[in-house]
Amino acid sequence: AAVLPPYRRLVLDEAHHVEDTAAAHLGRQVTSRGVERLLARLERQNRGVLPALRAALVAEADETLREAALELLHARVEPALADARRSAELLFRYLDAFLAGKADNVVRLGDGFAEDPIWAGGLGDALDGLGYGLSTLREALITLAERITGEWEPGERIESLLGELRGACSRLEAARDAVRTALRPPAGAPPLVRWIERRGAAHVALAAVPLELAPLLKALLFDRVETVTLTSATLATGGTFDFLTSRLGLDLPPPREGVREVLASPFNYHEQCLFALPDDVPEPRDDAEGHGARVAAVAADLARAADGGLFALFTSHRALRQAAAVLKARPDVAGRWPLLVQGDAPRDQLLRRFRDAGSAILLGTDSFWEGVDVPGQALRALLIAKLPFRVPTEPLTAARCEAIEASGGDAFNEYLVPLAGLKLKQGFGRLIRSRTDVGVVVLLDPRVLRKRYGARLLAGLPPARRVVGSWEELRRDIEEFFELHGIGRDE
C-alpha cells in the first residue's frame, strides 16, 4: 500500500542522492543479525510478541478460542520458529565460512558463483531449508492471526500484537526473497549486482541491486507525475546537468520538456574564502604514509593559524584514525583546542560540541561531507585530505564502471570523476554558510594540480580566491587572510 496519498507534482531536494537512494530501496538486502533480531522479536527466552500474545489470549479470549489459538501456537508456530532459527544459523554459517577464505570482507557474486564448490558443500540445501523455514513460519503466523480474527473481535491489546505479527510476516517474506535473489536469482531476472559482506564476527550481509536504475526511476517515479523539480547545491557537473539526467533516466525517450538552470550563489566567495592548493604534498596513492603525516602536520598548522575552528574531512576511517592519533599526541594541538573525532561520540553530539566550543577541531569522514551547517566563526578553516573518489572495487561501483566500459565508454571520466566532483563540491560547501562567513579551504591532494581531470574538478568549485604554492608559502597567505579578517591565534 502507498504511504503517500496520490500526487501529481514531485519536488526532490538533495536530488544528487536519488540514484543511491533508489539503489537502497529497489534493491534487496538482508543481514544475519537482522534475521536473528526478527526471529527474536517473535520469541526469545519467553519474551517477545508470541509470549505477549499468549498471555493476552489467556486473559481476554473465551475458552474455545483460547484453546484453539494456544494449540496453534504450540503445534505449528513454535516448531516453525525453531526450525527457521536453525535454518538461518546454518545458512549464515556457510556464508561466514565462505568469506573466511577470502582476502576481502566484501565479495561480489558474479555468474561464476553458481559453480562455486560451496553449493555442493551444502549451501544449496541450506538455502532451500531457509526458504522453506521462513515460508512455513510466515504461513503459521498468518493462520494464527486469521483464526483469532475470524472467530472473535479482539480488543486493542491483542489487535496491536496481531499488527506486529502481520509486520513480521512481511519482513519474513522480504528476508526470504532477499536471500534467494542475492544467492540464486531467478532465471530471466534483470541484471543484478550481488555481493556478500562480512560486517564483523558472525555478522554477514547479502545484497542484490539492479544494475540499471535509470529505466526503473523513469517508469516508477518520473513518468507517474506531471511535473518533477530536482534541487541541490550539487546537481551540475562542468556547468551542465548531463551526468545527472543520464544517471536518473531523464534523457530516455520519450523526451520531456524541462527547464535546467544553475543559480548563482548568494555568497561573495572571492572575498569570503581563500582556497589553498599546496603543490609539495606527497600523492596519497604513491606515498600513503607520507601523505598521512603531511595531513596531520597541515591540520596542526591550520588550527594554529585559525585558532581552532577547523573541520578536517577524510575519505577513509583509517586515514582519519591515523591523523587523530598524531594530533592527540601533540600537546600543542590536543592540549589547546578540543579535538573531536568521528566515532568518539554520535554525529549530532560532535557537531553540537564543535559549535559550542567555538575553537574546536573536528575530524570526520563521509557523513560530515554534507548535511552539516555551522554558520559563523565556529567554523573558519576546512581541510580536505584527499579527493573523494569512490572505491572502484566496491561491488556497485565496479559493476557500473564495467557496464560503461562494455558500452564503449570511459568509466573513470564519465562516472568516477563526475561523482568525485559532486562530492568535493559538497565538502567545500561546508565552510561558507552565510554572507558574513569567512574562512580558508585547503585541499591536500596534488592530483588536482597534476592530473588532467583536476581542472574539471576545480572548475566545479565555488569561485574562491585560489592560491597555489608550497605549504610554507601558503601558510603565510593563510595567516595574512585570517589577520585581515580579525581571525587568528592569540599567543
Predicted regions, residues:
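ASCE RecA-like P-loop NTPase motor cores
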Residues: 1-491
